[in-house]
Amino acid sequence: MKLNKYFVIDFDSTFTKVEAFDVLADISLHDHPEKEERKKQIIQITNQGMDGSISFRESLERRLNLLAPSRQHLSPLINQLRGSVSESFKRNKEFFQKYADNIYIISNGFKEFIEPIVTEFGIKTENILANEFKFDQEGRVIGFDMENPLSANGGKVEQLKKLNLPGDVYVIGDGYTDYEIKHAGLANKFYAFTENVERENVKKGADHITPSLDEFLYLNKLNTVISYPKNRINVLLLENVHPVALALLKAEGFNVETYHAAMTEEELCQKIKNVSVLGIRSKTQVTAKVLESANRLM
């Protein structure tokens, strides 16, 4: 289907639930005597890069030196990332297949581990823009392509300028570098993706906060499998309802609130007003008065 809209999507903590470098650290440093110390340093360097105290390129170089990755680490990394795709992305695989020509993955991560994940959703290889490793003859990572704009500050903005997409551009991501695309005037809207992580400075600059891909598709009338986003359905669980039930509801994308004890009739009357699903145990009494207050209960 021909569509005059383009979707620019981040990878780490957006397409996947995790940061790939965090997973890579557990793999490449698994038997390293300085594993915990190096992981702490990597986090510190990442934060320094994010707050601007060091350049993104310096952050990348220093983290790779600490990680000391090689080709042999890529296969287990890819396997773990494959199992860490965001739940709402998994639910909407048809969207990626239907609009493959219009979807771009733009990431400051590395193509070697991004491509195997996103191409399984139908995303085209040529629409994946990311950094690329450089290897020595033994397969050890010795650096990255420094000519790639994504290895430096403002890389995503530079890539969007080069693409010069002929239509409306919608950016979906969790990070400040995603917001920068909109700030530079290269996107019509920026959607702060909060399914996995929430960053206040990113949310402040967003046109819309989207807790799931379902919400984004609903807002833009692109729904393929869900007619109404589950994140808009409020669920209230009282009296320490079993954690498995909580996990399953959250995995499905519902907006879940929990309370450890039972509620009085008055408390429940106030709390239930915007609740669609109520989970209780024996101590909570759902009276006629409570039901009168439940204007959204299914």
Where does each model-flagged region fall?
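Alpha-helical substrate-recognition element adjacent to the catalytic core
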Residues: 2-132
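A short helix->loop->beta-strand "cap" motif at the edges of active sites that frequently abuts
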Residues: 99-101, 187-188, 294-298
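Acidic, Mg2+-coordinating phosphoryl-transfer loop and its flanking beta/alpha structural elements
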Residues: 107-108, 168-211
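Short, polar loop motifs at secondary-structure junctions
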Residues: 111, 133-134, 176-177, 194-198, ...
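Short, conserved loop/helix-junction motifs that constitute active-site signature segments
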Residues: 122, 183-185, 290-296
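Histidine/lysine/aspartate-rich catalytic loop segments that bind and position anionic ligands
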Residues: 122-150
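Conserved Lys-Pro-Asp/Glu-containing loop-to-beta segment of HAD-superfamily phosphomonoesterases
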Residues: 151-179
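An N-terminal-biased, well-structured beta-alpha scaffold segment characteristic
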Residues: 228-298
